[in-house]
C-alpha cells in the first residue's frame, strides 16, 4: 500500500499476470454523482480496462461501474469512457512512452483518498505465454524454499 493511500475499492489482478508493470502513477477520475456512489460501494470492475492518450487528455475505457441502485434517471452508461486527471507533463510523458513502443496503460487499482476516487495507472508491456509460465515457476520455487526454511526453523 502506497503512502497516503486510502480504502482500496477494486484491484486488477489480471493486469499483473498479463503485463510487466514498468511504472505506476496516480490519476484522479472524472465521475458523476451516482458513479462515485457505486465506486464507494465497490461495484467496479477493472478487468478489461485500458487507458489511451487522445488530444492531450487521458481516457479510461472498458471499465465497468455498475449503475447505482437508487440512481434511476441519473445513472450513466456502465462502460462509458471516463476522463483521467493528470498533470500536463505526466500526460506528455505517457504519450511519448506509449506511442509505437508496445507499451500500454492499464488500471491496476481504484481507491478512495481524501474523499476522491483515485486510480493507480500502470505503464505496462505485454507478457508472452512463456514469460507467464516462468513467473509462475519462480513463484512456486520461492514458496517451496520458504516452506523448507520454515520446517528447518521449527526444529
Swiss-Prot record:
CDD domains xref list: SmpB
Q: Output one GO BP term.
A: trans-translation
Q: Where's it found, cell-wise?
A: Cytoplasm
This protein's GO CC annotations: cytosol
A molecular function annotated in GO for this UniProt entry is: RNA binding
State whether keyword Ligase applies: no
Print the keywords alphabetically.
Answer: Cytoplasm, RNA-binding
Specify where it is mainly localized.
Answer: cytoplasm
The record ties this protein, via InterPro entries, to: SmpB, SsrA-bd_prot, SsrA-bd_prot_CS
Superkingdom in the source lineage: Bacteria
- Tell me, in a sentence or two, what this protein's role is: Required for rescue of stalled ribosomes mediated by trans-translation. Binds to transfer-messenger RNA (tmRNA), required for stable association of tmRNA with ribosomes. tmRNA and SmpB together mimic tRNA shape, replacing the anticodon stem-loop with SmpB. tmRNA is encoded by the ssrA gene; the 2 termini fold to resemble tRNA(Ala) and it encodes a 'tag peptide', a short internal open reading frame. During trans-translation Ala-aminoacylated tmRNA acts like a tRNA, entering the A-site of stalled ribosomes, displacing the stalled mRNA.
The text of the family note is: Belongs to the SmpB family.
This chain belongs to which protein, by name? SsrA-binding protein
The species this protein belongs to is Streptococcus pneumoniae (strain P1031)
Source organism lineage? Bacteria, Bacillati, Bacillota, Bacilli, Lactobacillales
